[in-house]
A protein has these predicted regions:
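Charged, low-complexity intrinsically disordered terminal segments
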Residues: 1-224
Length: 224
């Protein structure tokens, strides 16, 4: 996949969960049409419950809320959150849920590591932050330190397409929880800033090295 850079975006760097979750929760609270959220981990902690509550409130307002989590990273999601979310009208699924003990087999290592959110197809969040408190760590470890980017502008359409495609794939695979793909919100194509951005995905099949190649090309093209 060749990086398709789009001008006219506004990018906001969010430092760790301290900056990310207030921004995400505010965006969820303002949603009027649809929400897509993907996460490898959805922890049973204060942050997890704050996000779950915000999603439930959005669904109660009539917003289409779609949540996809990994079946190993969020292996307790089905018991910790699924009943509450589905009762509120949230559509939630697990990617490749693990049944029984996790034995090391190559095909079981294919996980959903993406951490993405798209709100009303107008603002997207991309980065490395799971739905988990920064301080939810063993006592002898430092808090998590990671970043996310808030994206507004034409580039949101690329992220929106990716989350809808993943929802379609996981829904097809979840025979007992198949959901019809609703008509999408219209991605915002209006200029939101002066920054150029491209969204790239990585997988172990067709796009294994796309991000690496984009890094190398960007470094080679650097002028300052």
């Amino acid at each position: 996949m060749v990086a398709e850079y789009l001008p006219g975006n506004r990018l906001t760097l969010l430092n760790s969960g301290e900056a990310y979750f207030p921004a995400l929760l505010a965006a969820i609270a303002s949603a009027t049409e649809e929400i897509y959220l993907e996460s490898y981990i959805f922890a049973d902690d204060e942050i997890g419950h704050e996000v779950a509550t915000a999603l439930c409130l959005a669904a109660a307002r009539g917003v289409r809320v779609n949540v996809t989590v990994d079946g190993f990273g969020a292996r307790n999601f089905a018991t910790d959150f699924m009943p509450r979310l589905t009762a509120a009208g949230v559509r939630a699924m697990q990617y490749r849920p693990e049944i029984g003990r996790f034995h090391l087999k190559r095909h079981r290592l294919r996980r959903l590591h993406r951490k993405l959110a798209v709100i009303d197809a107008r603002v997207a969040y991309v980065g490395g932050i799971n739905v988990i408190d920064d301080f939810n760590a063993p006592a002898d470890m430092c808090p998590r330190y990671d970043y996310a980017v808030q994206l507004e502008g034409p580039g949101v359409g690329q992220v929106h397409h990716a989350v809808r495609r993943m929802w379609e794939i996981v829904s097809w695979a979840n025979f007992k929880r198949r959901f019809r793909l609703a008509p999408p919100a219209t991605p915002c194509c209006e200029k939101a800033g002066e920054q150029t951005a491209a969204f790239l995905i990585r997988d172990n099949i067709r796009h294994r090295n796309d991000i690496l190649h984009a890094y190398i090309q960007a470094i080679a093209d650097a002028k300052n």
